[in-house]
Amino acid sequence: MPLSSAPSVSTGFASSVIFDLDGTLVDPAGAITGGIAAALAAHRVPVPSQQVLDSMVGPPLLTSLKALPGVTQENVASIMDHYRSSYLNSGMAASKVYPGIRELLQTLGEFGVARAVATSKPEPLAHRLLEVQGLAGLIDSVHGSHPDETVPHSGKTEIVAAALSAVGADGVDEHQRRDRVVMVGDRIFDVAGAHAHGLRCIGVTWGYAPEGELEAAGADHLAADAAQLADLLQQLLGLSSSLRSALA
């Protein structure tokens, strides 16, 4: 349903939702952290604690790897290749869509709300993950980092900017944009990327943020499950029909 024909969306409220991917729509279910650990071990690099591994879900992987003891300019590319190969071969399929997310995306589309993804994952991998998880048809545009992870990396602010352009919200003033677009993510980077463009951000607590991170980052709202997220989106987007009912 095109945006212009959606009677459920009130003019002046958000008409788009920008979602993070890993930890927000899809649970890597250990595919990312386990894959990183295996790649490090294969290169005889010390494997960090689970807490550190969890913190690597969200930000650019190359940046996170370079911060680890034992990762050098000489071995980082090989570690990345090892991880990516494992992720493509088995990690994507092992990932799982969070409960209620598929139904929520479907209903947002039926209400005429544009659904974009803004992720630090390389864009081709993001497309592939959405296809493998059966979500590709429920997302209107996908925005990620450069496929070559050795080139300067686009930050979340730049990736959100690309999503805003895709949904047609880059040409409106900040007040209108704030009323029409909502960001949803699980890490500090999502909150910062949203606020850099004057957007409200719903932080989902089922992802990979350490305790207190989303609150400290200034997330405008918090959702503990898809039902709470549905209620918040209904309120912020000014929808006249219930999103929560689609999750039953």
Task: Label each region the model flagged.
Residues 123-182, 188-196, 211:
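Substrate-recognition "cap/lid" segment bordering the active-site pocket of phosphatases
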Residues 7, 12-13, 89-117, 123-127, ...:
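Short, acidic loop-to-helix structural element flanking the phosphoryl-transfer center
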Residues 2-55, 69:
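Active-site neighborhood of HAD-like aspartate-dependent phosphohydrolases
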Residues 134-144, 213-230:
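Structural recognition of alpha->loop->beta junctions
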Residues 183-223:
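Acidic, Mg2+-coordinating phosphoryl-transfer loop and its flanking beta/alpha structural elements
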Residues 66-103, 111, 173:
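Metal-dependent phosphoesterase signature
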